């Protein structure tokens, strides 16, 4: 039906007859001529309908926005004075010689010229996706996926599918469960990742595997998470952590170069502890120049328990952020930041304005200055490299509270005061994560997942002091977003059992949940390592948006529902009966609805 896309037309096609299919983006009557901006997925071109073409002109008079049409016409170059430099096709127009209305359109429930509510956009997503902004994002996503496949194919990786109906295993989030009709009372789980299957593929001899795969996690949502998401899953045998990072970094740098013409350069490598200490986060945004500076040694002897208490506690921390030009912050603004850090458990936010750096103690203004002497203030100014016009913000509490509160405050200050340079890209690797982390009750949990190898110790050494062990894990971070994470895997059955034991998984449970893995590890398992990227998050960054819903064709809401199809919905009672399932909650809700009526 078509010979060209609207957005591909240019001067090289002058005089040629083309056939186009698409939608009416806009129609205008000017001086007896009808002008149509015709749109398809590749762009917009201007069509001119002359009244001398009577049949075409009569049909063109009937056109309204979003009519689906087919058009035949001749490409002609616009006069220089009429060139539209805002359009990719602005040097040409089409003189219509034929027109067919394929389908008419009712008045749209969305207004493409205004901001529509998120709810309306998701409910009528098929219309929202017609907008060039959205269309461009979905096309860029397709290009990113195509690039990944091409790169990995060229580097001897095999695209291998893994099961979607599988066994529930503890990976940190709740599983989506699928009931079995054949095995009544039993359930499959939708995979949170293909983790165990890709490890089994390494044991099968497929030493370079990849898959662009759907994964599912029943967890609380936020702007960069969805219940179903797409992962670029990669696993290798006989490669070190450094080699995995090298090849995946090469993939990302070449992707950015091809799709954005941006040179990311070589990624710096930062240890987990350094990232927390300097930036208050294991995914630091290095575009933001603010850093956390430890000052416990300076404040440990002051006569102010708020500072000296944590400064002398091995589980405490006292740190500051120096904000260039921050002395201009009003008391109201400081109070707002005090409320903000309270979200993270901080009990307050002490501050010190540097009104005159050369004057030392006499040149600072602070509600806590009376507790500090000249030497302490001088040391603080030197340690933070403060200058006239700056403000120093203090955090003093447990290590966790100070790190989280000041880390979040750092990001907020960078945004509010426009200190974060959004014109640049700052990637890095974060490595040497702790193997385990404690919950509020002192129990250990795997920081990544229980199949991650510890760094440089034996199973016996790990069992002695597991809380002190680091893992051979690594995350790729770009502009404050974790875009990929991976690790060297455990390839020894004894080590795997040791990790399970530390996590409180008893031998019987090990066999029931992971017996197949422990068995497979007995048969010449190669050393293996891998990494998984979040495709949605990568494309979100490539597109310059801050919400992954913008780069998914049909996303869910933050309540994990689809406004387009009204999923999830109540199941047919006959289907539930066939599955031997009784849904008590649904009955209660139904009773409430009936009583309300």
UniProtKB/Swiss-Prot annotation:
Pfam families: GAD, tRNA-synt_2, tRNA_anti-codon. Keywords: Aminoacyl-tRNA synthetase, ATP-binding, Cytoplasm, Ligase, Nucleotide-binding, Protein biosynthesis. ATP binds at residues 217-219, 226, 482, 534-537. Its main location: cytoplasm. Disulfide bonds: none annotated. One of its GO terms (cellular component) is cytoplasm. Residues 195-198 are annotated as: Aspartate. CDD domains: AspRS_core (cd00777), EcAspRS_like_N (cd04317). It catalyses: tRNA(Asp) + L-aspartate + ATP = L-aspartyl-tRNA(Asp) + AMP + diphosphate. InterPro entries: Aa-tRNA-synt_II (IPR004364), aa-tRNA-synth_II (IPR006195), aa-tRNA-synth_II/BPL/LPL (IPR045864), Asp-tRNA-ligase_1 (IPR004524), Asp-tRNA-ligase_1_N (IPR047089), Asp/Asn-tRNA-synth_IIb (IPR002312), AspRS_core (IPR047090), GAD-like_sf (IPR004115). GO terms for molecular function: aspartate-tRNA ligase activity; ATP binding; nucleic acid binding. It is found in: Cytoplasm. SUPFAM superfamilies: Class II aaRS and biotin synthetases, GAD domain-like, Nucleic acid-binding proteins. Its EC number is 6.1.1.12. HAMAP family: Asp_tRNA_synth_type1. Belongs to the class-II aminoacyl-tRNA synthetase family. Type 1 subfamily. Homodimer. This is Aspartate--tRNA ligase.
């Amino acid at each position: 039906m078509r010979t060209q896309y609207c957005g591909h037309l240019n001067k090289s096609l002058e005089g040629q007859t083309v056939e186009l299919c698409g939608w009416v983006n806009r129609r205008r009557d000017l001086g007896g001529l009808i002008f149509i901006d015709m749109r398809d997925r590749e762009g917009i071109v201007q069509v001119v309908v002359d009244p001398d073409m009577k049949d075409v002109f009569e049909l063109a008079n009937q056109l309204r926005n979003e009519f689906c049409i087919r058009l035949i016409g001749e490409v002609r170059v616009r006069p220089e004075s009429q060139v539209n430099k805002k359009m990719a096709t602005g040097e040409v127009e089409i003189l219509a010689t034929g027109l067919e209305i394929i389908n008419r359109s009712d008045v749209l429930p969305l207004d493409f010229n205004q901001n529509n509510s998120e709810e309306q956009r998701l409910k009528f997503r098929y219309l929202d996706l017609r907008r060039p902004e959205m269309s461009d994002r979905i096309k860029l996503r397709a290009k990113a996926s195509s690039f990944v496949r091409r790169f990995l194919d060229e580097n001897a990786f095999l695209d291998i599918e893994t099961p979607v109906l599988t066994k529930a295993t503890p990976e940190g989030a709740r599983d989506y469960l699928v009931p079995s009709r054949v095995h009544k009372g039993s359930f499959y789980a939708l995979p949170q990742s293909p983790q165990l299957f890709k490890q089994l593929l390494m044991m099968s001899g497929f030493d370079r595997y990849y898959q662009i795969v759907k994964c599912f996690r029943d967890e609380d949502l936020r702007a960069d998470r969805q219940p179903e998401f797409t992962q670029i899953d990669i696993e290798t045998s006989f490669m070190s952590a450094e080699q995995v990072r090298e090849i995946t970094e090469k993939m990302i740098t070449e992707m950015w170069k091809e799709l954005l013409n941006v040179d990311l350069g070589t990624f710096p490598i930062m240890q987990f502890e350094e990232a927390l200490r300097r930036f208050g986060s294991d995914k630091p945004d290095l575009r933001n120049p603010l850093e956390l500076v430890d000052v416990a040694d300076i404040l440990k002897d002051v006569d102010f328990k708020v500072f000296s208490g944590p400064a002398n506690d091995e589980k405490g921390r006292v740190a500051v952020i120096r904000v260039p030009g921050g002395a201009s912050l009003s008391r109201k603004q400081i109070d707002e930041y005090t409320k903000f850090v309270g979200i993270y458990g901080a009990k307050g936010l002490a501050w010190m304005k540097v009104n005159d750096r050369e004057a030392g103690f006499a040149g600072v203004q602070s509600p806590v200055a009376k507790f500090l002497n000249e030497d302490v203030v001088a040391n603080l100014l030197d340690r933070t490299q403060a200058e006239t016009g700056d403000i120093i913000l203090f955090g003093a509490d447990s290590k966790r509270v100070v790190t989280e509160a000041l880390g979040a405050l750092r990001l907020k200050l960078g945004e509010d005061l426009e200190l974060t340079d959004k014109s640049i890209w700052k990637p890095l690797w974060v490595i040497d994560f702790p193997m385990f982390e404690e919950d509020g009750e002192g129990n250990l949990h795997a920081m990544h997942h229980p199949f991650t190898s510890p760094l440089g110790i034996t199973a016996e050494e790990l069992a002695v002091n597991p809380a002190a062990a680091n893992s051979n894990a690594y995350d790729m971070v770009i502009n404050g977003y974790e875009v990929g994470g991976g690790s060297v895997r455990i390839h020894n059955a004894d080590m795997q059992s040791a990790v399970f034991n530390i996590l409180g998984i008893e031998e019987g449970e090990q066999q029931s949940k992971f017996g197949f893995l422990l068995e497979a590890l007995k048969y010449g398992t190669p050393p293996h390592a891998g990494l998984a990227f979040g495709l949605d998050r990568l494309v979100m960054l490539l597109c310059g948006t801050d919400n992954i819903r913008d780069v998914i064709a049909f996303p869910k809401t933050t309540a994990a529902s689809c406004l387009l199809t009204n999923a999830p919905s109540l199941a047919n009672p006959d289907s539930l009966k066939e599955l031997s399932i009784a849904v008590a909650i649904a009955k209660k809700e139904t009773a409430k609805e009936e009583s309300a009526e």
